[in-house]
């Protein structure tokens, strides 16, 4: 390739002959190092430092900042769209919630009518049943009382009458027996007394002879009275009168029947009067008002959530701008320090090259890539053997070439950008649970409003039902209580009247207490049992319509209904929080998923780019390993003639180019040793083909710049450095 074809001399006035720039040279022919501030064709330290502000790392950081700002802008747009969709979804949920919370309003009228009709039918049926029950109880009660009274009173009458008749008969027979026995006894006594009187009288006559006069004994009068002794005729008169006075209890029975039937008939009359005109008042039932829920626009709702996210992204944007811009500015400091060290290192390497370089291409590489070459030299120290050290340096040079480093830096910058976006996305995701919690509270508000309306309606309706219970208990079962009281009073009157009759009949006689005990045993105990039963009826005779539950219109009741209608139903009623949460938070989740997908894609691309760099590294290592165990060659030992010999002749320009010093010596004082760089020349071209030299070895040595196969030659006399646009030509390899 001829450089003169692309850069003619006449068109490059900025590149005169190097020796013509300044005529002053050292005695060895080398141009001295230019003084500070001098004009040079290459960039000096100040020129390099003037370009620090757009170094590669600053540019990469600014590119990362630009990508992050683009991502934040896209996220802001997505959040605005998500806010709009979330508000739309919230409005629909708000409408559904308002409708559900207003459900008691729509259902109350029908339920009130149903309740009123049920109460009317229940009361009418109750009245009819009560009338029939009262009639049945009346007849049963009267029959029971009549059975007891008539049976037991007839028994008492039988017993008393039999006893009276027996007593009168006994008295009559006793009178007859007494009359008969007293007459006979009087006659016998009279006969015995007559003989005794005669004896006594004779004895008295004897006594009288002695001057004492004895009275005569005469018992005719007492004996006559004894003979006439008998029971009085009026002894049975009282018993006959008592027999005639024994009652048949007909009056008691009639009085008792009338007294027993009177309260029952009164109750039946009142029941008939109430049945005919009873109508339940529907207007007393409450009707809940409609509910209009407002939770989408309230404080702490969706607006607050998205405003918080917008503030978060704005803060993140400011932080990224501040951090990355400051980092881009601060990175100029180490880059400036790096340039200064690189400048000093380049100057040091120039002297090092003059002393120790083996290959002009190696010299150019060391000077142009100081850090990569330093890393290669450091890596080469880990191995022994010249060949392996060269291969280690070659691997480092291969993976730190500008294209490879650009590939690596591009991948690292992409990953760093993904990391920045991931931090922002993580901050956004942390706020999503708060939205889920807020949205879950929407359902709680609907549930609370519905429960509140249901509870208010139930309280009002239950109050009406309780008033109806009280009214029925006072009007109907109050009569029942009066009836039971009247029946109890009637029974008491019956007992009292019966006791009075017995008292008037048997009072003061020996039969009063036995008859009273018999009455208590046969009738009194039964009447006491009936009175206890009537008292129990009076205490428990009341109606109690059941109250409505407070959650009649609540979500639990509606949930049960929905489950009964559809066992697989998946509705807002069955799980009010989840559906609302899914419907609104899904919008935010979709945005975060979209951003996360973009970050994942960028991270994959960056990882692929970095993996390509690692693949390049692997290729370099594999290539180096294929040449790792070759034999080392001594310096200048080409192992005979090359298979592809160098050209025998070079043009004048090319020959001149081979004589150009590789660096300009520094300023030295006269008398100091010459430290100019040695001049490199190649071995004389071989004219014969060495059959023992492998073409593959030649190809590999050519790729490595024929390291170790050149002889070092130092010119003894100085010469003036000449500028040349020489042409470099190779027979088999042309580099463009």
From Swiss-Prot:
One of its GO terms (cellular component) is mating projection tip. It is found in: Cell membrane. The chain crosses the membrane at residues 57-77, 140-160, 316-336, 396-416, 602-622. The keyword Cell membrane applies. GO terms for biological process: plasma membrane fusion involved in cytogamy. Residues 1-56, 161-315, 417-601 are extracellular. It is a multi-pass membrane protein. Keywords: Cell membrane, Conjugation, Glycoprotein, Membrane, Transmembrane, Transmembrane helix. InterPro entries: PRM1. Residues 1-33, 717-736 are annotated as: Disordered. Glycans are attached at residues 228, 254, 452, 481, 488, 503, 550, 565. Belongs to the PRM1 family. Involved in cell fusion during mating by stabilizing the plasma membrane fusion event. This is Plasma membrane fusion protein PRM1. It comes from Ajellomyces capsulatus (strain NAm1 / WU24).
């Amino acid at each position: 390739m001829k450089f003169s074809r692309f850069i003619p001399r006449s068109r490059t006035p900025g590149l005169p002959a190097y020796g013509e720039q300044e005529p002053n040279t050292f005695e060895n022919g080398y141009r001295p190092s230019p003084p500070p501030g001098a004009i040079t064709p290459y960039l000096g330290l100040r020129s390099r430092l003037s370009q620090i502000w757009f170094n590669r790392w600053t540019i990469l950081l600014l590119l990362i900042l630009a990508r992050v700002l683009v991502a934040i802008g896209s996220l802001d747009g997505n959040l605005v769209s998500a806010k709009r969709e979330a508000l739309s979804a919230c409005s629909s949920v708000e409408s559904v919630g308002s409708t559900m919370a207003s459900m008691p309003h729509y259902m109350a009228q029908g339920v009130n009518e149903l309740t009123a009709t049920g109460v009317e039918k229940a009361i009418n049926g109750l009245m009819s049943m009560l009338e029939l029950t009262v009639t049945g109880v009346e007849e049963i009660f009267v029959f029971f009382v009549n059975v007891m009274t008539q049976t037991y009173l007839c028994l008492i009458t039988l017993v008393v009458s039999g006893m009276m008749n027996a007593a009168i008969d006994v008295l009559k027979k006793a009178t007859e027996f007494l009359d008969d026995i007293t007459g006979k006894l009087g006659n016998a006594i009279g006969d015995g007394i007559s003989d005794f009187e005669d004896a006594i009288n004779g004895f008295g006559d004897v006594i009288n002879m002695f001057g004492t006069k004895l009275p005569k004994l005469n018992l005719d009068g007492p004996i006559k009275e004894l003979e006439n002794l008998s029971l009085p005729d009026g002894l049975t008169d009282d018993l006959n009168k008592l027999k005639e006075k024994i009652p048949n209890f007909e009056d008691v029975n009639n009085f008792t029947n009338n007294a027993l039937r009177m309260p029952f008939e009164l109750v039946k009359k009142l029941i008939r009067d109430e049945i005919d005109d009873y109508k339940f008042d529907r207007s007393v039932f409450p009707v809940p008002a409609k509910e209009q829920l407002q939770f989408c626009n309230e404080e702490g709702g969706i607006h607050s959530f998205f405003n918080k996210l917008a503030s978060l992204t704005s803060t993140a944007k400011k932080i990224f701008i501040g951090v990355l811009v400051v980092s881009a500015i601060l990175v100029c400091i180490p880059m400036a320090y790096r340039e200064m060290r690189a400048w000093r290192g380049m100057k040091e390497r120039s002297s090092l090259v003059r002393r120790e370089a083996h290959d002009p291409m190696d010299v150019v590489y060391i000077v142009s890539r100081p850090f990569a070459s330093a890393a290669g030299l450091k890596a080469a120290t880990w191995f022994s053997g010249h060949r392996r050290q060269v291969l280690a340096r070659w691997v480092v040079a291969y993976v730190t070439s500008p294209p490879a480093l650009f590939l690596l830096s591009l991948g690292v910058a992409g990953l760093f950008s993904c990391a920045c976006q991931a931090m922002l996305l993580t901050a956004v995701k942390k706020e999503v649970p708060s939205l889920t919690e807020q949205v879950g509270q929407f359902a709680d508000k609907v549930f609370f409003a519905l429960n509140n309306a249901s509870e208010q309606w139930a309280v009002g309706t239950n109050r009406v039902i309780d008033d109806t219970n009280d009214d029925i208990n006072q009007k109907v079962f109050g009569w029942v209580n009066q009836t039971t009281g009247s029946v109890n009073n009637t029974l008491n009157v019956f007992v009292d009247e019966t006791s009075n009759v017995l008292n008037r009949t048997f009072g003061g006689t020996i039969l009063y207490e036995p008859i009273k005990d018999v009455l208590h045993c046969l009738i009194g105990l039964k009447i006491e049992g009936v009175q206890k039963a009537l008292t129990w009826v009076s205490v428990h005779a009341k109606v109690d319509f059941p109250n409505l539950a407070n959650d009649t219109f609540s979500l639990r009741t509606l949930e049960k209904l929905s489950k009964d209608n559809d066992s697989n139903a998946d509705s807002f009623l069955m799980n009010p929080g989840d559906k609302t949460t899914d419907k609104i938070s899904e919008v935010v989740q979709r945005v975060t998923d979209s951003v996360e997908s973009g970050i994942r894609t960028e991270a994959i691309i960056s990882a692929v780019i970095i993996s390509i760099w690692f693949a390049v590294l692997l290729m370099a290592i594999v290539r180096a390993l294929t040449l790792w165990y070759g034999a080392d060659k001594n310096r200048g030992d080409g192992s005979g003639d090359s298979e592809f010999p160098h050209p025998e002749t070079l043009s004048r320009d090319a020959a001149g180019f081979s004589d150009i010093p590789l660096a300009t010596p520094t300023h030295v004082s006269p008398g100091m040793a010459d430290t100019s760089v040695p001049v490199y020349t190649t071995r004389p071209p071989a004219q014969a083909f060495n059959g023992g030299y492998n073409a593959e070895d030649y190809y590999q040595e050519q790729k490595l710049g024929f390291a170790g196969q050149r002889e070092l030659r130092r010119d003894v006399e100085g010469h003036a450095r000449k500028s040349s646009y020489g042409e470099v030509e190779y027979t088999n390899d042309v580099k463009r």
